[in-house]
Amino acid sequence: TLGLSMMVVALAQARASGAVQGAMAATEATVEGPFFWPGAPEVPLGADIAEGVPGEPTLYMGRVTDVDGKPLAGALLDVWSGDGDGKYDVQLSAEPTMKARGRLRTDAEGRYWFWSIRPTYYPVPDDGPVGDMLRATNRNINRPGHIHLMVSAEGHVPLTTHIFVAGSPFIDEDV
């Protein structure tokens, strides 16, 4: 199930990227996951999107470029993560609080930076077929700490990816 989901994402990304000027995807795509929620607020560069969730304050920064390394000014990043206890806002209430979520645009050099928390590992929901499969294959149910980014820019194929916390438990066993 998990391998097939990732294969579908990889093939779709390759097909979509190839349709845009014969380009290859420079960053591997991943599944959106169950915790994405549309409508996060757009915030300025440097904002703190954590809004008081538990966890270690962390500055995230990077650069969005095209496949040739040219900066993508004005690219939109939709960011979301769990908190320092391994929970997403949508797991804690019926409606998302939009904490540890935000949308921001890159500057003229394609750079972005924002504050949030350093997310920790968490177990995937294992009460359905995914849990059955993980148990049957003797795989770990935990995901290492990570943040999600959905990146879109005019003339480019949207990309959903994630950035893992270095040294996070289970980093070598991600489901």
Where are these regions (language model features)?
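Beta-strand-dominated extracellular/periplasmic modules and repeats
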Residues: S5-V175
